[in-house]
Each structure stands twice: as C-alpha cells, then as structure tokens.
Amino acid sequence: MSWHTGSNQDNKLFPKGKLSGSYAPLDIAFENSPAMNEFENRLCHNNPIISERSMSPAVSASYSNPEATSCGCMQTQTQPQHQTLSQHLPQTHHTDAHDQQKLSGIFYNRTTDAQNQFSETINPPPSYTVHNTDIRIPLNRQQQYPANHLGSELLEGYNNVGTEPCMGFWEILLLIILIAVLVYGIYWLYKSEK
C-alpha cells in the first residue's frame, strides 16, 4: 500500500487514493503511531493543566525516562490497551474528587478577586459627585455612579431619559417643521396631478 501526505514531508500518514488533499482519516488520530505520540508529547509538555494521570503511557513515561531524543520528543513505548485503561482508572472516588477540586480551584476560585474588587481600599469610590441625569445606557457597578443612581431598575436596563412630562423647545420646533414639510409635499403632489 502506498502512502502520501500531499507534500514531500512524511510519506507514512495517508493512504494514496483514499483521501482528497492532505486530510487524515479519524483512525489515524487514534492509532499508536510515532507521529501521533510525538504530537501528544508536544501537546502535553506545552500544556501545564494536563496532569500526569491523564496522559498516555508514552507521554507520561517521558517525565520519568531521561532518554529523550535530540529534539526533546520521546521514543514511542507501546503498551497493551488493558494496561493503559488500568493506569487511568482512579484508585478511589475521594482522591479523584479531591484532585478535581484542587485543579478547578486554581482556575475558578475568584473569591479573592471579588473581595479586592469590592474593597474600598483597593477600589475607592470617586470623591466627586456625578450630576448626570441623562444616563443613556444601563448602569453597572464599574461606572461608579453615586448610590442614588444604583437602583435595581437602572441596573436592569431602565433609563430615565425623556421622562419629563413635556417636550423640549427644540423637539417641538422640529415636529412643527416636519409637519409643514409633509403638508407641503402632499399639496405639491396634489397640484402636479392636475
């Protein structure tokens, strides 16, 4: 069987005639080949989140095996599938839950960030007062408006623009001009038809 990649780099990945372009079938990704082990090795070495328990045996052996090649990649070490599965099974539910909680706590525990955000020593409120009554966007707490503007209605998207009972002078003048233009346009159309 002949193989091709669409380029002259590595002629051992794709069967000729079965593929269009240089895309591999899905079973190549799960095959225990040197190319895929090298890819997984590089991925795991550059990703600090991955723990040693979740790595494949060839990659986890790279942490304990000092015989790496010159490019930093490990030689592939094949193991039977049942040994791979038994290594990945957790010993107890408690240790697995504890490790998961410890890992997620690093990235999702934001209580100290929230305390720093709402602490007045780190984020003091402004010393000036805001006299803006024409707030055109929903308020949020980071805009630091005074407390009388931080009602629940304003935080939910309510704005108080245009709540005065009568229209302003310029709005009335604009309305009169628009009505006059509309009447003149209707009159001009009526005259042009006759």
Curated annotation (Swiss-Prot):
Residues 77-96 are annotated as: Disordered. It is found in: Host membrane; Virion. Keywords: Host membrane, Membrane, Transmembrane, Transmembrane helix, Virion. Residues 77-92 have a biased composition (Polar residues). It comes from Acanthamoeba polyphaga mimivirus. The chain crosses the membrane at residues 169-189. It is a single-pass membrane protein. GO terms for cellular component: host cell membrane; membrane; virion component. It comes from the Viruses. This is Uncharacterized protein R710.
